Amino acid sequence: MILPKRTQEKEISLLMHYLDEVFPLQFPFHERRYVGKREWLLTILASTRPVYYATLSLSLLHKEACLHEFEAELAEIWQKEKMRYYILALQESQQQLDALDTAYGIAKMKGNIHALASTLQLISFESSSLSKGDWQLHLRAGTSLIPVLIDGWAVALKSDKVASSSSLWTELDASDFNATHDEDSLSYEYVGALKFFANVLAMFGIFSCISIGPSSPFMEYRFLMDQAGLIQMDQIMGCRNWAMLAILEIGTLDKWKREEQENRRLSLKALTSRAMAIEGVLESGLREASGSALVDLITSIYATSALTYLHTVVSGLNPNLSEVQESVAATIVLLKRLPDLRAAKSLVWPLGVTGCMASRSQEDFFRGLIISAGATPRALRNCWGLMKVWEDTWKMREYMSKQPPERWEEVVSGQGPPMLLM
Protein backbone atom coordinates (compact mmCIF):
# COMPACT_ATOMS: atom_id res chain seq x y z
CA MET A 1 0.00 0.00 0.00
CA ILE A 2 1.31 3.43 -0.99
CA LEU A 3 0.57 5.98 1.72
CA PRO A 4 1.71 9.53 2.52
CA LYS A 5 5.00 9.34 4.38
CA ARG A 6 3.67 10.71 7.67
CA THR A 7 0.67 8.38 7.59
CA GLN A 8 2.93 5.48 6.72
CA GLU A 9 5.22 6.22 9.65
CA LYS A 10 2.31 6.29 12.11
CA GLU A 11 0.80 3.11 10.75
CA ILE A 12 4.10 1.23 10.84
CA SER A 13 4.45 2.38 14.44
CA LEU A 14 0.97 1.02 15.22
CA LEU A 15 1.81 -2.23 13.48
CA MET A 16 4.92 -2.64 15.60
CA HIS A 17 2.89 -1.81 18.72
CA TYR A 18 0.58 -4.66 17.79
CA LEU A 19 3.48 -7.08 17.33
CA ASP A 20 5.23 -6.02 20.53
CA GLU A 21 2.29 -5.48 22.88
CA VAL A 22 -1.06 -6.67 21.56
CA PHE A 23 -0.28 -10.04 19.99
CA PRO A 24 1.33 -11.35 23.22
CA LEU A 25 -1.80 -10.25 25.13
CA GLN A 26 -4.08 -12.00 22.65
CA PHE A 27 -2.08 -15.23 22.67
CA PRO A 28 0.12 -15.36 25.78
CA PHE A 29 0.49 -19.14 25.56
CA HIS A 30 1.47 -19.13 21.88
CA GLU A 31 4.29 -21.66 21.64
CA ARG A 32 7.11 -20.29 19.50
CA ARG A 33 9.13 -23.48 19.29
CA TYR A 34 6.88 -24.94 16.64
CA VAL A 35 6.93 -24.57 12.88
CA GLY A 36 6.86 -21.01 11.64
CA LYS A 37 7.04 -19.39 15.07
CA ARG A 38 5.80 -15.87 14.19
CA GLU A 39 7.82 -15.65 10.98
CA TRP A 40 4.63 -15.52 8.92
CA LEU A 41 2.82 -12.89 10.99
CA LEU A 42 4.00 -9.60 9.51
CA THR A 43 3.56 -10.98 5.98
CA ILE A 44 -0.12 -11.61 6.64
CA LEU A 45 -0.81 -8.44 8.63
CA ALA A 46 0.53 -6.21 5.86
CA SER A 47 -0.76 -8.34 2.98
CA THR A 48 -4.18 -6.80 2.37
CA ARG A 49 -6.12 -3.76 3.47
CA PRO A 50 -8.77 -5.55 5.60
CA VAL A 51 -6.18 -7.36 7.75
CA TYR A 52 -4.01 -4.26 7.91
CA TYR A 53 -6.78 -1.88 8.98
CA ALA A 54 -8.31 -4.35 11.45
CA THR A 55 -4.91 -4.75 13.08
CA LEU A 56 -4.38 -0.99 13.30
CA SER A 57 -7.79 -0.53 14.95
CA LEU A 58 -6.93 -3.25 17.48
CA SER A 59 -3.57 -1.61 18.17
CA LEU A 60 -5.26 1.75 18.81
CA LEU A 61 -7.84 0.07 21.03
CA HIS A 62 -5.01 -1.16 23.24
CA LYS A 63 -3.24 2.22 23.21
CA GLU A 64 -6.48 3.89 24.25
CA ALA A 65 -6.85 1.41 27.11
CA CYS A 66 -3.40 2.34 28.41
CA LEU A 67 -4.15 6.07 28.66
CA HIS A 68 -4.58 7.84 31.98
CA GLU A 69 -7.70 9.80 32.89
CA PHE A 70 -5.93 13.15 32.45
CA GLU A 71 -5.16 12.30 28.81
CA ALA A 72 -8.76 12.78 27.66
CA GLU A 73 -7.84 14.95 24.67
CA LEU A 74 -5.44 12.34 23.32
CA ALA A 75 -8.01 9.62 23.98
CA GLU A 76 -10.54 11.45 21.83
CA ILE A 77 -8.07 11.61 18.93
CA TRP A 78 -7.23 7.94 19.22
CA GLN A 79 -10.89 6.97 19.46
CA LYS A 80 -11.62 8.75 16.18
CA GLU A 81 -8.64 7.11 14.47
CA LYS A 82 -9.56 3.73 15.92
CA MET A 83 -13.08 3.93 14.52
CA ARG A 84 -11.81 5.22 11.18
CA TYR A 85 -9.57 2.18 10.77
CA TYR A 86 -12.32 -0.12 12.01
CA ILE A 87 -14.80 1.20 9.44
CA LEU A 88 -12.16 0.90 6.73
CA ALA A 89 -11.55 -2.70 7.80
CA LEU A 90 -15.28 -3.50 7.52
CA GLN A 91 -15.55 -1.87 4.09
CA GLU A 92 -12.43 -3.56 2.75
CA SER A 93 -13.48 -6.92 4.22
CA GLN A 94 -16.73 -6.83 2.27
CA GLN A 95 -14.88 -5.97 -0.94
CA GLN A 96 -12.45 -8.79 -0.25
CA LEU A 97 -15.24 -11.32 0.21
CA ASP A 98 -16.89 -10.15 -3.01
CA ALA A 99 -13.59 -10.58 -4.88
CA LEU A 100 -13.30 -14.18 -3.68
CA ASP A 101 -16.29 -15.10 -5.85
CA THR A 102 -14.19 -14.69 -8.98
CA ALA A 103 -10.86 -15.94 -7.62
CA TYR A 104 -9.56 -19.48 -8.06
CA GLY A 105 -6.60 -21.69 -7.23
CA ILE A 106 -3.85 -20.44 -4.96
CA ALA A 107 -5.12 -16.86 -5.19
CA LYS A 108 -8.45 -17.96 -3.74
CA MET A 109 -6.77 -19.94 -0.95
CA LYS A 110 -4.68 -16.92 0.01
CA GLY A 111 -7.76 -14.72 -0.17
CA ASN A 112 -9.59 -17.02 2.24
CA ILE A 113 -6.68 -16.85 4.68
CA HIS A 114 -6.73 -13.05 4.45
CA ALA A 115 -10.49 -13.06 5.05
CA LEU A 116 -10.11 -15.28 8.10
CA ALA A 117 -7.28 -13.15 9.50
CA SER A 118 -9.27 -9.92 9.24
CA THR A 119 -12.39 -11.61 10.63
CA LEU A 120 -10.55 -12.85 13.72
CA GLN A 121 -9.02 -9.44 14.33
CA LEU A 122 -12.51 -7.93 14.16
CA ILE A 123 -13.77 -10.53 16.65
CA SER A 124 -10.94 -9.57 19.02
CA PHE A 125 -11.93 -5.93 18.62
CA GLU A 126 -15.68 -6.43 19.10
CA SER A 127 -15.44 -8.95 21.96
CA SER A 128 -13.07 -6.78 23.97
CA SER A 129 -14.25 -5.42 27.30
CA LEU A 130 -13.67 -1.99 25.75
CA SER A 131 -15.99 -2.54 22.79
CA LYS A 132 -18.68 -5.06 23.78
CA GLY A 133 -19.84 -5.16 20.18
CA ASP A 134 -21.38 -7.70 17.82
CA TRP A 135 -18.63 -10.31 17.66
CA GLN A 136 -21.18 -12.97 16.66
CA LEU A 137 -21.55 -11.47 13.19
CA HIS A 138 -17.83 -11.85 12.52
CA LEU A 139 -17.70 -15.32 14.08
CA ARG A 140 -20.42 -16.49 11.71
CA ALA A 141 -18.39 -15.11 8.81
CA GLY A 142 -15.30 -16.95 10.04
CA THR A 143 -17.22 -20.19 10.54
CA SER A 144 -18.49 -20.04 6.95
CA LEU A 145 -14.87 -20.30 5.79
CA ILE A 146 -14.24 -23.66 7.50
CA PRO A 147 -14.83 -25.83 4.37
CA VAL A 148 -12.41 -23.84 2.20
CA LEU A 149 -9.83 -23.70 4.99
CA ILE A 150 -9.93 -27.48 5.25
CA ASP A 151 -9.52 -27.73 1.48
CA GLY A 152 -6.49 -25.45 1.74
CA TRP A 153 -5.01 -27.61 4.48
CA ALA A 154 -5.51 -30.74 2.36
CA VAL A 155 -3.59 -29.08 -0.48
CA ALA A 156 -0.83 -28.02 1.91
CA LEU A 157 -0.48 -31.57 3.21
CA LYS A 158 0.17 -32.81 -0.33
CA SER A 159 2.96 -30.27 -0.79
CA ASP A 160 6.26 -30.03 1.07
CA LYS A 161 5.23 -26.89 2.92
CA VAL A 162 4.17 -28.55 6.16
CA ALA A 163 7.70 -28.66 7.54
CA SER A 164 8.87 -30.66 10.51
CA SER A 165 11.70 -28.35 11.53
CA SER A 166 11.54 -25.55 14.07
CA SER A 167 11.89 -22.84 11.43
CA LEU A 168 10.47 -22.51 7.95
CA TRP A 169 13.79 -21.05 6.75
CA THR A 170 15.54 -24.42 6.91
CA GLU A 171 13.16 -25.77 4.25
CA LEU A 172 13.47 -23.01 1.64
CA ASP A 173 15.14 -23.47 -1.73
CA ALA A 174 16.25 -21.07 -4.47
CA SER A 175 12.80 -20.95 -6.09
CA ASP A 176 11.35 -19.38 -2.95
CA PHE A 177 13.54 -16.33 -3.53
CA ASN A 178 12.85 -16.10 -7.27
CA ALA A 179 10.65 -13.08 -7.95
CA THR A 180 9.52 -14.48 -11.33
CA HIS A 181 8.61 -17.89 -9.93
CA ASP A 182 4.90 -18.65 -10.40
CA GLU A 183 3.26 -19.80 -7.22
CA ASP A 184 1.64 -23.20 -7.59
CA SER A 185 1.27 -23.84 -3.86
CA LEU A 186 0.90 -21.94 -0.62
CA SER A 187 4.15 -20.52 0.74
CA TYR A 188 5.44 -21.49 4.17
CA GLU A 189 4.21 -18.17 5.49
CA TYR A 190 0.66 -18.85 4.31
CA VAL A 191 0.65 -22.43 5.58
CA GLY A 192 1.78 -21.12 8.98
CA ALA A 193 -0.96 -18.48 8.91
CA LEU A 194 -3.60 -21.01 7.83
CA LYS A 195 -2.74 -23.30 10.72
CA PHE A 196 -2.57 -20.53 13.30
CA PHE A 197 -5.82 -18.79 12.34
CA ALA A 198 -7.72 -22.08 12.00
CA ASN A 199 -6.78 -22.84 15.61
CA VAL A 200 -7.87 -19.39 16.75
CA LEU A 201 -11.20 -19.79 14.95
CA ALA A 202 -11.76 -23.14 16.69
CA MET A 203 -10.88 -21.56 20.04
CA PHE A 204 -13.29 -18.63 19.57
CA GLY A 205 -16.01 -20.95 18.31
CA ILE A 206 -15.78 -23.40 21.20
CA PHE A 207 -15.67 -20.61 23.79
CA SER A 208 -18.76 -19.04 22.21
CA CYS A 209 -20.90 -22.13 22.82
CA ILE A 210 -21.53 -21.26 26.46
CA SER A 211 -22.30 -17.62 25.57
CA ILE A 212 -24.87 -18.17 22.82
CA GLY A 213 -26.09 -21.70 23.54
CA PRO A 214 -27.66 -24.07 21.00
CA SER A 215 -27.37 -21.61 18.12
CA SER A 216 -23.65 -22.40 17.96
CA PRO A 217 -22.63 -24.40 14.85
CA PHE A 218 -21.24 -27.34 16.86
CA MET A 219 -20.80 -29.69 13.89
CA GLU A 220 -18.71 -27.18 11.94
CA TYR A 221 -16.29 -26.73 14.85
CA ARG A 222 -16.12 -30.50 15.33
CA PHE A 223 -15.32 -30.92 11.63
CA LEU A 224 -12.50 -28.39 11.98
CA MET A 225 -11.13 -30.02 15.14
CA ASP A 226 -11.02 -33.41 13.42
CA GLN A 227 -8.55 -32.33 10.72
CA ALA A 228 -5.33 -34.28 11.22
CA GLY A 229 -2.37 -32.07 12.08
CA LEU A 230 -4.24 -28.79 11.59
CA ILE A 231 -5.63 -28.14 15.06
CA GLN A 232 -3.08 -28.21 17.88
CA MET A 233 -4.57 -25.99 20.54
CA ASP A 234 -1.72 -26.43 22.99
CA GLN A 235 0.50 -24.45 20.61
CA ILE A 236 -1.92 -21.51 20.62
CA MET A 237 -3.63 -21.43 24.02
CA GLY A 238 -1.73 -23.92 26.17
CA CYS A 239 -4.64 -26.39 26.33
CA ARG A 240 -4.55 -29.75 24.58
CA ASN A 241 -7.16 -30.70 21.99
CA TRP A 242 -8.91 -33.35 24.09
CA ALA A 243 -10.03 -30.84 26.72
CA MET A 244 -11.36 -28.39 24.13
CA LEU A 245 -13.14 -31.21 22.32
CA ALA A 246 -14.78 -32.20 25.60
CA ILE A 247 -16.06 -28.63 26.06
CA LEU A 248 -17.48 -28.78 22.55
CA GLU A 249 -19.13 -32.12 23.31
CA ILE A 250 -20.71 -30.68 26.45
CA GLY A 251 -22.15 -27.81 24.42
CA THR A 252 -23.52 -30.35 21.95
CA LEU A 253 -25.03 -32.33 24.85
CA ASP A 254 -26.68 -29.16 26.16
CA LYS A 255 -28.23 -28.53 22.75
CA TRP A 256 -29.48 -32.13 22.51
CA LYS A 257 -30.95 -32.01 26.02
CA ARG A 258 -32.87 -28.81 25.30
CA GLU A 259 -34.25 -30.18 22.04
CA GLU A 260 -35.37 -33.37 23.77
CA GLN A 261 -37.01 -31.37 26.56
CA GLU A 262 -38.85 -29.17 24.07
CA ASN A 263 -40.19 -32.29 22.36
CA ARG A 264 -41.05 -33.89 25.74
CA ARG A 265 -38.96 -36.98 25.06
CA LEU A 266 -35.86 -36.49 27.23
CA SER A 267 -34.48 -39.86 28.33
CA LEU A 268 -32.59 -39.60 31.61
CA LYS A 269 -30.89 -42.89 30.73
CA ALA A 270 -29.57 -41.47 27.45
CA LEU A 271 -28.58 -38.19 29.12
CA THR A 272 -26.68 -40.03 31.84
CA SER A 273 -24.96 -42.31 29.34
CA ARG A 274 -23.77 -39.44 27.16
CA ALA A 275 -22.64 -37.41 30.15
CA MET A 276 -20.71 -40.33 31.63
CA ALA A 277 -18.86 -40.84 28.34
CA ILE A 278 -17.69 -37.21 28.37
CA GLU A 279 -16.84 -37.40 32.07
CA GLY A 280 -14.76 -40.51 31.38
CA VAL A 281 -12.74 -38.69 28.72
CA LEU A 282 -12.10 -35.77 31.05
CA GLU A 283 -11.09 -37.90 34.02
CA SER A 284 -8.82 -40.06 31.87
CA GLY A 285 -7.21 -36.97 30.39
CA LEU A 286 -6.69 -35.46 33.82
CA ARG A 287 -4.82 -38.54 34.97
CA GLU A 288 -2.53 -38.33 31.94
CA ALA A 289 -2.02 -34.56 32.33
CA SER A 290 -0.55 -34.80 35.80
CA GLY A 291 2.94 -33.68 34.77
CA SER A 292 4.72 -30.52 35.83
CA ALA A 293 4.72 -28.79 32.43
CA LEU A 294 2.67 -25.59 32.10
CA VAL A 295 0.63 -27.13 29.28
CA ASP A 296 -0.42 -29.93 31.66
CA LEU A 297 -1.53 -27.41 34.27
CA ILE A 298 -3.45 -25.22 31.81
CA THR A 299 -5.10 -28.26 30.23
CA SER A 300 -6.10 -29.56 33.66
CA ILE A 301 -7.64 -26.19 34.59
CA TYR A 302 -9.78 -26.33 31.45
CA ALA A 303 -10.68 -29.98 32.07
CA THR A 304 -11.83 -29.54 35.68
CA SER A 305 -13.80 -26.45 34.62
CA ALA A 306 -15.35 -28.55 31.85
CA LEU A 307 -16.45 -31.04 34.51
CA THR A 308 -18.26 -28.19 36.28
CA TYR A 309 -19.85 -27.22 32.95
CA LEU A 310 -20.90 -30.84 32.38
CA HIS A 311 -22.48 -31.26 35.83
CA THR A 312 -24.49 -28.06 35.40
CA VAL A 313 -25.71 -29.08 31.94
CA VAL A 314 -26.90 -32.42 33.31
CA SER A 315 -28.32 -31.33 36.68
CA GLY A 316 -28.85 -27.58 36.40
CA LEU A 317 -26.86 -24.52 37.48
CA ASN A 318 -26.91 -25.38 41.16
CA PRO A 319 -23.69 -24.54 43.08
CA ASN A 320 -24.84 -26.69 46.01
CA LEU A 321 -24.52 -29.97 44.09
CA SER A 322 -21.71 -32.09 45.55
CA GLU A 323 -20.25 -32.91 42.13
CA VAL A 324 -20.17 -29.21 41.24
CA GLN A 325 -18.47 -28.34 44.53
CA GLU A 326 -15.85 -31.05 43.93
CA SER A 327 -14.92 -29.86 40.43
CA VAL A 328 -14.86 -26.21 41.54
CA ALA A 329 -12.55 -27.09 44.44
CA ALA A 330 -10.30 -29.07 42.08
CA THR A 331 -10.01 -26.09 39.73
CA ILE A 332 -9.12 -23.76 42.60
CA VAL A 333 -6.31 -26.10 43.66
CA LEU A 334 -4.93 -25.99 40.11
CA LEU A 335 -5.26 -22.20 39.82
CA LYS A 336 -3.19 -21.83 42.98
CA ARG A 337 -0.41 -23.78 41.27
CA LEU A 338 0.02 -21.25 38.45
CA PRO A 339 3.69 -20.16 38.50
CA ASP A 340 2.61 -16.64 37.56
CA LEU A 341 -0.87 -15.50 38.55
CA ARG A 342 -0.89 -13.02 35.68
CA ALA A 343 -1.59 -16.02 33.46
CA ALA A 344 -5.07 -16.15 34.99
CA LYS A 345 -6.03 -13.13 32.86
CA SER A 346 -5.96 -15.44 29.86
CA LEU A 347 -8.09 -18.17 31.45
CA VAL A 348 -11.38 -16.33 31.13
CA TRP A 349 -13.50 -19.34 30.14
CA PRO A 350 -12.50 -21.63 33.04
CA LEU A 351 -12.64 -18.72 35.49
CA GLY A 352 -16.09 -17.78 34.25
CA VAL A 353 -17.54 -21.26 34.65
CA THR A 354 -15.81 -22.05 37.94
CA GLY A 355 -16.37 -18.67 39.58
CA CYS A 356 -20.09 -18.67 38.84
CA MET A 357 -20.49 -21.98 40.66
CA ALA A 358 -18.26 -21.03 43.62
CA SER A 359 -19.52 -21.23 47.19
CA ARG A 360 -19.75 -18.23 49.49
CA SER A 361 -16.47 -19.17 51.19
CA GLN A 362 -14.69 -19.21 47.81
CA GLU A 363 -15.81 -15.77 46.64
CA ASP A 364 -12.81 -13.92 48.08
CA PHE A 365 -10.42 -16.28 46.32
CA PHE A 366 -11.82 -15.29 42.94
CA ARG A 367 -11.94 -11.59 43.75
CA GLY A 368 -8.33 -11.75 44.90
CA LEU A 369 -7.25 -13.75 41.86
CA ILE A 370 -8.52 -11.06 39.49
CA ILE A 371 -6.54 -8.42 41.39
CA SER A 372 -3.41 -10.58 41.62
CA ALA A 373 -3.62 -11.32 37.91
CA GLY A 374 -3.39 -7.60 37.19
CA ALA A 375 -6.73 -7.44 35.39
CA THR A 376 -8.15 -3.95 34.81
CA PRO A 377 -11.50 -2.59 33.59
CA ARG A 378 -9.79 -1.30 30.44
CA ALA A 379 -8.26 -4.38 28.88
CA LEU A 380 -8.53 -6.35 25.67
CA ARG A 381 -9.59 -9.54 27.40
CA ASN A 382 -12.80 -9.90 29.41
CA CYS A 383 -11.21 -11.01 32.67
CA TRP A 384 -12.30 -7.92 34.62
CA GLY A 385 -15.82 -8.30 33.24
CA LEU A 386 -16.05 -11.61 35.08
CA MET A 387 -16.32 -9.69 38.35
CA LYS A 388 -19.79 -8.43 37.45
CA VAL A 389 -20.86 -11.83 36.13
CA TRP A 390 -19.73 -13.49 39.36
CA GLU A 391 -21.26 -10.91 41.68
CA ASP A 392 -24.60 -11.07 39.86
CA THR A 393 -24.56 -14.87 39.99
CA TRP A 394 -23.56 -15.00 43.65
CA LYS A 395 -26.48 -12.73 44.54
CA MET A 396 -28.78 -15.32 42.98
CA ARG A 397 -27.17 -18.25 44.82
CA GLU A 398 -30.09 -18.96 47.16
CA TYR A 399 -32.53 -18.70 44.29
CA MET A 400 -30.34 -20.96 42.13
CA SER A 401 -30.40 -23.73 44.74
CA LYS A 402 -34.22 -23.75 44.66
CA GLN A 403 -34.86 -23.08 40.99
CA PRO A 404 -31.63 -22.98 38.94
CA PRO A 405 -31.63 -20.97 35.71
CA GLU A 406 -31.69 -23.34 32.77
CA ARG A 407 -29.29 -21.53 30.48
CA TRP A 408 -25.63 -20.63 30.84
CA GLU A 409 -26.01 -17.82 28.32
CA GLU A 410 -28.38 -16.07 30.73
CA VAL A 411 -25.78 -16.27 33.49
CA VAL A 412 -22.81 -15.22 31.34
CA SER A 413 -24.44 -12.32 29.53
CA GLY A 414 -27.27 -11.27 31.83
CA GLN A 415 -29.46 -8.70 30.10
CA GLY A 416 -26.66 -7.33 27.93
CA PRO A 417 -25.09 -8.53 24.68
CA PRO A 418 -23.46 -11.98 24.72
CA MET A 419 -20.01 -11.96 26.29
CA LEU A 420 -17.26 -14.01 24.68
CA LEU A 421 -15.29 -15.64 27.50
CA MET A 422 -11.81 -14.99 26.21
UniProtKB/Swiss-Prot annotation:
GO terms of molecular function: DNA-binding transcription factor activity; transcription cis-regulatory region binding
Domain of life: Eukaryota
Compartments, record wording: Nucleus
InterPro entries, sorted: Fun_TF
Major site of localization recorded for this protein: nucleus
A Pfam short name: Fungal_trans_2
Record-level GO cellular component terms: nucleus
GO terms (BP aspect): positive regulation of transcription by RNA polymerase II
Keywords, comma-separated and alphabetical: Nucleus, Transcription, Transcription regulation
Keyword Transcription regulation set for record: yes
Keyword Transcription among record annotations: yes
Protein role: Transcriptional activator of all of the trichothecene biosynthesis genes. Acts upstream of the cluster-encoded transcription factor TRI6 and is necessary for full expression of both the other trichothecene genes and the genes for the primary metabolic pathway that precedes the trichothecene biosynthetic pathway.
Similarity comment text for this entry: Belongs to the TRI10 transcription regulator family.
Xref: PANTHER family: TRANSCRIPTION FACTOR, PUTATIVE-RELATED, TRANSCRIPTIONAL ACTIVATOR PROTEIN UGA3
Protein name: Trichothecene biosynthesis transcription regulator TRI10
Species, as recorded: Trichoderma arundinaceum
